[in-house]
Amino acid sequence: MSLFALFYMLFAYLLGSVSSAILICRIAGLPDPRQNGSHNPGATNVLRIGNRKSALAVLIFDMLKGMIPVWAGYYLGLTQFELGMVALGACLGHIFPIFFQFKGGKGVATAFGAIAPISWAVAGSMFGTWIFVFLVSGYSSLSAVISALLVPFYVWWFKPEFTFPVALVCCLLIYRHHDNIQRLWRGQEDKVWAKFKKK
């Protein structure tokens, strides 16, 4: 990687470190997502403890954190491998944010945003997988884990030059969901629409 690419990856990390869930909850007067619900600062938990508008705002912002640096990297002349590492940097920032004691979200929305400029076919396959599993199961976490397991194969098929960095991103996503995997195994994971059934 070039020196510029390393600094640009650092920029992507810093951008990823801006936790939209925490900031939007503060602005909207909602509880701290790190201390309520699933204790995860992400769109799903904001939906759980707050409302749809706030959750949608978090989702869009988190996707843009991954999409903007990778998209801009194309126009800055970064190589394909460097673009993949920039995507990794944005996801690392979201998962381990320097501005919030390195305790961040799961990284799914940021990973989707980062992968979209790399390959719309991969992003579409990832989104389709997530939606299918979610509609069948109702579990956001299970949808994310299965998507993360399959995305490296999608990348290998459509854009093989990005397989290594994207596989690293997917390993991060699976690692970040280890608590969810245990709850799924024990049958203790909440379905997303459980909140609306209680109303």
Swiss-Prot record:
<dbReference type="GO" id="GO:0005886">
    <property type="term" value="C:plasma membrane"/>
</dbReference>
<keyword id="KW-0594">Phospholipid biosynthesis</keyword>
<protein>
    <recommendedName>
        <fullName>Glycerol-3-phosphate acyltransferase</fullName>
        <ecNumber>2.3.1.275</ecNumber>
    </recommendedName>
</protein>
<feature type="transmembrane region" description="Helical">
    <location>
        <begin position="56"/>
        <end position="76"/>
    </location>
</feature>
<comment type="function">
    <text>Catalyzes the transfer of an acyl group from acyl-phosphate (acyl-PO(4)) to glycerol-3-phosphate (G3P) to form lysophosphatidic acid (LPA). This enzyme utilizes acyl-phosphate as fatty acyl donor, but not acyl-CoA or acyl-ACP.</text>
</comment>
<keyword id="KW-0997">Cell inner membrane</keyword>
<comment type="pathway">
    <text>Lipid metabolism; phospholipid metabolism.</text>
</comment>
<keyword id="KW-0808">Transferase</keyword>
<feature type="transmembrane region" description="Helical">
    <location>
        <begin position="115"/>
        <end position="135"/>
    </location>
</feature>
<dbReference type="Pfam" id="PF02660">
    <property type="entry name" value="G3P_acyltransf"/>
</dbReference>
<comment type="similarity">
    <text>Belongs to the PlsY family.</text>
</comment>
<feature type="transmembrane region" description="Helical">
    <location>
        <begin position="4"/>
        <end position="24"/>
    </location>
</feature>
<keyword id="KW-1208">Phospholipid metabolism</keyword>
<keyword id="KW-0444">Lipid biosynthesis</keyword>
<dbReference type="InterPro" id="IPR003811">
    <property type="entry name" value="G3P_acylTferase_PlsY"/>
</dbReference>
<keyword id="KW-0812">Transmembrane</keyword>
<feature type="transmembrane region" description="Helical">
    <location>
        <begin position="80"/>
        <end position="100"/>
    </location>
</feature>
<feature type="transmembrane region" description="Helical">
    <location>
        <begin position="154"/>
        <end position="176"/>
    </location>
</feature>
<dbReference type="GO" id="GO:0008654">
    <property type="term" value="P:phospholipid biosynthetic process"/>
</dbReference>
<keyword id="KW-0443">Lipid metabolism</keyword>
<keyword id="KW-1003">Cell membrane</keyword>
<dbReference type="GO" id="GO:0043772">
    <property type="term" value="F:acyl-phosphate glycerol-3-phosphate acyltransferase activity"/>
</dbReference>
<comment type="subunit">
    <text>Probably interacts with PlsX.</text>
</comment>
<keyword id="KW-0472">Membrane</keyword>
<keyword id="KW-1133">Transmembrane helix</keyword>
